[in-house]
Amino acid sequence: MRGLLIILIKFYKKFISPVLPKSCRFYPTCSTYALEAIERFGAFEGGILAIKRILRCHPFNPGGYDPVPTKEEFLELKLKRRKNK
């Protein structure tokens, strides 16, 4: 599944993205973020991070620098969420 998602994102970046107007409000772009997240965390957790990022990419969000979290940062976020439940 991970490999398939990576192939689809690379296809999008190479063939679809160049013909669309630049609209991503973030750096790295949402497709680059998704690729890095899936490579780092796998299809499920990386996919969730990618979806959350894409949902934040809209005209009412100022955007800016938003890198994929490190494994340590991601683990801290997961632990905080579990404590708050």
Swiss-Prot record:
Keyword entries, A-Z: Cell inner membrane, Cell membrane, Membrane
A UniProt-annotated Pfam family: YidD
Coiled-coil regions, chain positions: none
Intracellular or extracellular location(s): Cell inner membrane
Ion transport keyword on record: no
InterPro entries to which the protein is assigned, alphabetical: Membr_insert_effic_factor_YidD
Superkingdom of the organism of origin: Bacteria
Topology with respect to the bilayer: Peripheral membrane protein
GO CC aspect terms: plasma membrane
PANTHER family linked: MEMBRANE PROTEIN INSERTION EFFICIENCY FACTOR-RELATED
Family: Belongs to the UPF0161 family.
The protein's role, per its UniProt record: Could be involved in insertion of integral membrane proteins into the membrane.
Protein's recorded name: Putative membrane protein insertion efficiency factor
